[in-house]
Amino acid sequence: VSGQQGKQALPEIEPTASGDALYKVLGNAARGLYMLIARVEIAGRENLPKSGGYIIVANHTTELDPVTVAFPAFVEGALPRFLAKDSLFRAPVLGYIMRKLAHIPVVRGSVDARKSLITARKIVEAGGAVIIFPEGTTTHDPQLWPMQAR
């Protein structure tokens, strides 16, 4: 299946037991490191469902946002899947991790972009968590907020 401007679409990514185990190892390592370098207080934790799927939508202002936004869900036992631009899945190390952890690639501006929403919906319907940064990129200038979804 081809994506935007002839780019080869990424294969559909499905969670696996080994990927989930790696997610837990990396998540716990990130959690420990995060607790060492930052004083973390999770406000609104009670709003995360104890059962059933859900979507977290957040602004994307720093490169630490994925860890920061996923942190409460991870602490509550979820392995949230991110919708992320497909180029991240093509990076040598990060791409391997993104694919292994079953995050969801978005091929912007193509018919394949719809597939990412279908995948996200399946995850939520199966009781999982999905994280979306609607801007699709980071922005450091509050004057540009609210950004338009891409």
What is the predicted role of each segment?
Residues 19, 27, 36-150:
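Soluble catalytic domains of membrane acyltransferases
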